Regions:
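Short, compositionally biased low-complexity segments
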Residues: 32-39, 127-132, 168
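Alpha-helix boundary/N-cap detector
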Residues: 2, 28, 32-35, 50, ...
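Alpha-helical scaffold segments that mediate packing/assembly in large oligomeric complexes
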Residues: 131-207
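Assembly/oligomerization interface modules of large self-assembling protein complexes
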Residues: 52-132
Length: 330
């Protein structure tokens, strides 16, 4: 089939697939080449909707190539900043170690005497693995009506579902690992205080040079409204707040605001609520395992294409959890 041949040629162009799919989904302007790709893709999808045939599973191949390119090859600035990133084979495993601390004790002793032994702790850490899977259907009617937009929407949303799950798991795991001590800064209220934010920034600046604060936009906005905070803002910072409603830095540390309107498929926020996280340098490693596999079944009786995205696997090792601190709100 000529259309299938053209689609396969398009799939060989790195980075093109998702750009076109995302622009079609979010109604962004296409250039001449992208319009041609969208037209070819549209004819391909409508033909599948008419015939109920896709013997080479080109929809699954399209989704698989696109999502793999975006998930495994495209940079993710925030996760790249707080984790050492890597990848291993589907059937491989890995391990890590915490930084060795000097816990040897020099005791006062009589000449020629003996003292209590002290030891160096060399702890081996195994990753915590997560495996995510997405399943859904596209109806033949939808393929005939909307053509390529049906597949573009599905592809874009599958990619976002995977990325959102990865981000949520990363911050949730670090959150669960910190239960007390100076890493936990509790505020007896619903908004951050100057004292709490100062404690967080001091903790981070004592431990790293490339630090970041991560929180929901509503708390990034609340930081600016803290009593007595305005006196610490430069004119440029005040202009930024008046324009965007958010602060971009606190005590020299970048503030990454996460939209509260953006949620996972099950309705959860992208990070736990009532939290302001701080990370000094890196908190550990994040390894992607293998690659995604996408399968499809043609269900002509119910006029649907069943799509299964499987094996989105990744593992965390929190080798430097001491570089993580959080402010908790009521």
């Amino acid at each position: 089939m000529a259309i299938n041949s053209e689609i396969k040629d398009i799939m060989e162009k790195d980075g093109v697939l998702f750009d076109v799919a995302e622009k079609v989904e979010y109604k962004r302007e296409l250039n001449a080449e992208e319009k041609e790709i969208a037209e070819i893709s549209d004819a391909w999808c409508r033909e599948i909707g008419k015939s109920g045939k896709d013997p080479e599973c080109t929809i699954a191949e399209f989704i698989n190539r696109t999502v793999n390119e975006e998930i495994y090859n495209a940079p993710d600035e925030l996760l790249d900043q707080i984790f050492n990133r890597g990848s291993i084979g589907e059937f491989d495993d890995t391990e890590g170690t915490k930084d060795i601390k000097n816990t040897l004790v020099a005791h006062e002793a009589a000449k020629g005497g003996t003292v209590d032994r002290s030891y160096i702790d060399i702890s081996v850490i195994k990753p915590t693995w997560k495996n995510r899977q997405v399943e859904t259907d596209i109806s033949y009617v939808d393929l005939r009506r909307n053509g390529f937009k049906s597949v573009a929407t599905l592809t874009t949303f599958m990619k976002e579902a995977c990325q959102n799950a990865l981000f949520f798991d990363a911050l949730s795991m670090a959150d669960a690992a910190v239960t007390g001590g100076e890493q936990l800064i509790a505020v007896d209220g619903t908004t951050p205080t100057l004292e709490a934010m100062d404690a967080l920034s001091l903790y981070l600046n004592d431990r790293g040079d490339d630090n970041v604060i991560i929180t929901l936009n509503k708390y990034a906005q609340a930081i600016r409204r803290m009593p007595n905070f305005a006196q610490y803002l430069s004119s440029t910072m005040k202009d930024d707040f008046n324009r965007y409603g958010l602060v971009k830095t606190y005590d020299g540390i970048g503030v990454a605001g996460i939209s509260g309107a953006k949620k996972t498929g099950n309705g959860s926020l992208l990070l736990p609520d009532k939290r302001i996280y701080g990370i000094a340098d890196k908190i550990g490693t994040l390894d992607m395992k293998g690659e995604i596999h996408t399968y499809q079944d043609m269900n002509n009786q119910n006029e649907k294409v069943h799509i299964m995205l499987k094996d989105f696997a990744y593992g965390f090792m929190l080798t430097h959890i001491e570089n993580f601190a959080k402010v908790t709100l009521r």
